[in-house]
UniProtKB/Swiss-Prot annotation:
Name of the featured protein: Uncharacterized protein C11orf86 homolog
Provenance organism: Mus musculus
Chain positions covered by the region annotation Disordered: 1-28
InterPro entries: DUF4633 (IPR027990)
Segments of skewed composition (Basic and acidic residues): 9-28
Tree of life domain: Eukaryota
Length: 124
């Protein structure tokens, strides 16, 4: 009983697999450094000037003053300082999603402006 072509393909490595392993075999230091620099706002990104033209390259933290980076959010989360704000943002997000969901049904409203009798009255 010979092996089929399909089963052989699983046993023999394909050339594309070698490239995949090579790309994963890179040093983690470079990728880790890049990830950290992205999160800390060291990487540059283009900003838009209000008139629509592209402006100078500005770091993320310069563009968004007052926002916390991932590291600061993590530290604040460990201290427990941002849990109320996070809960409020989460509740607002849920409320927006719920309103969006309800709006997808044309005959359903979140609050009724009048009693059902008033809505059924056709004499108005």
């Amino acid at each position: 009983m010979g092996t089929s072509l399909r089963s052989q393909s699983f046993r023999e490595p394909r050339p594309s697999y070698g490239r995949l392993h090579e790309s994963q075999g890179r040093s983690l230091d470079g990728r880790l450094h890049r990830a950290l620099s992205l999160r800390l706002g060291r990487e540059k990104s283009r900003s838009q000037v209000p008139d629509g033209t592209e402006g100078l390259e500005v770091s993320v933290q310069e563009r968004l003053p007052g926002t916390l980076g991932d590291k600061e959010q993590l530290i604040q989360g460990q201290r427990g300082g941002g849990s109320r704000r996070w809960l409020r943002q989460y509740q607002q997000h849920v409320k927006r999603r719920w309103r969006s969901f309800v709006a997808s049904f044309p005959s359903v409203t979140l609050s009724q402006p009048a009693s059902p009798e008033t809505l059924l009255d056709t004499n108005n």
